[in-house]
Design a protein with these regions (language model features):
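Extracellular repetitive beta-rich solenoid segments
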Residues: 1-35
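Surface-exposed ligand/attachment interfaces on beta-rich extracellular proteins
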Residues: 21, 35-70, 79-94
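Short hydrophobic/aromatic-rich beta-strand motifs
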Residues: 25, 65-67, 74-75, 104-106
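Generic beta-strand structural signal
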Residues: 25-27, 67-69, 124-126
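Hydrophobic residues embedded in beta-strands of well-ordered beta-sheets
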Residues: 29, 72-74, 128-131
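Beta-strand residues in well-ordered beta-sheet regions across diverse protein folds
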Residues: 34, 75-77, 133
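Extracellular jelly-roll beta-sandwich "head" domains, especially the C-terminal globular C1q domain
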Residues: 58, 81-94, 98-150
Length: 150
């Protein structure tokens, strides 16, 4: 297809380690990889990072964290617990917040997914507040939450 340029994006979210992103460009020849640098995760509760609020804390082997990819999408990860349902767990900083309130569905692992687990509603507000709401159990997985930041 002469005269056409195609772009293909690959955004890889690795549960542990550093996220990666690649953009592949193809004109009239072969695909070319334009590697894009992606920031490291920001650990909730880490030095210079947002603090936990309302008794929320990390639990298990996947600490709460977030990052923004080169396309402006913010991704959360980790497992938190001990906070009261419907309270602010932490607040994302400016530049990592959604334009509109966003709502995500995850689960708590009180017994694991399936019969032992329960649905969790995670609201991320325009002021950066991250608010998990659940009916039973205390552990909340954040990995399903991602949105475009403004």
């Amino acid at each position: 297809m002469a005269g056409r340029t195609f772009l293909r994006f690959l955004n890889s979210f690795r549960h542990t380690g550093t996220p990666s992103s690649s953009t592949f460009l193809r004109g009239d020849g072969a695909w070319s990889n334009l590697e894009t640098s992606v920031e490291d995760f920001h650990a909730i509760g880490g030095a210079g990072e947002p603090a936990f609020q309302n008794s929320w804390a990390n639990t298990g082997s996947s600490p709460a964290a977030f990052y923004k990819d080169p396309f402006g999408r913010v991704y959360l990860r980790g497992n938190i617990n001990t906070g009261a349902s419907g309270t602010v767990a932490f607040t994302l900083p400016s530049g990592y917040r959604p334009e509109y309130n966003t709502f995500h569905v995850s689960y708590n692992n009180n017994g694991g997914p399936g019969p032992g687990g329960a649905a969790v509603h995670i609201e991320i507000q325009t002021d950066g507040d991250v608010i998990p709401t659940y009916g039973a159990g205390t552990d909340v997985w954040l990995d399903s939450a991602h949105f475009r930041a403004v």
